[in-house]
Amino acid sequence: FGQAGPRHGSAPDGGSTDFLPWMLPMELAMWNCVSCEMWSAYKMKQLGLISKCVPVINDKGKWVRNPAIITDKYIEDGEIVYGEFKIGEDAKKARDFVKSAKTDFELLDTEVNKILWTYTNLFPGCLIKSVEGIRMKKKFFWDQGKTVNRHWLAVNMNCEAYLGFNAFNTKKITGQDVIDFIEYRRRQAQGEAFDLEFMAAVLGKPQKS
């Protein structure tokens, strides 16, 4: 779970900005929305954003949870580590394991079937009214901001989004997927025109072949 957001020239309007404050504590909602960090499904389950995580790797008949995520302990040195990404050698071992691991969605299918069977045994009219009643809180803010958000997104495509999207799309050429944010802020603070020279100064340069 994560946002492309401000790191790549966008803002998750009509999505995360609407529902995250309802689904996470405010400070966590703010940080998840603006930091563009990736948070694991296990971390999101622990925080209450999702209701279930199931393993999809089957190793010789044994179900294995995501090996890149800490799931075998909750606390380390006084900090909650459950759901955090492994680092260093542990992360490398996890990536190597996943390359040859067998993917099996049996447990996921089972959980989906449980949800469907639960819904099947409910009055359909009451079910949809209940679902819409929960979603109404998000939709209220979506309706309040959808017009101004649309106009802002159109303008943004000619500025920060243009830079961010191009930086991301040319990663194979430049070796980097983001602009030079320090140079961008420096030129902006000096009041320089947003022109071709400005854009060339902050975008990555083609790597030498």
At which residue positions do the language-model features occur?
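A structural signal for hydrophobic residues in beta-strands of small regulatory alpha/beta folds
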Residues: 53-54
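C-terminal alpha-helix plus adjacent terminal tail
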Residues: 36-43, 57-209
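CoA-thioester-processing core
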Residues: 1-33, 45-47, 60-77
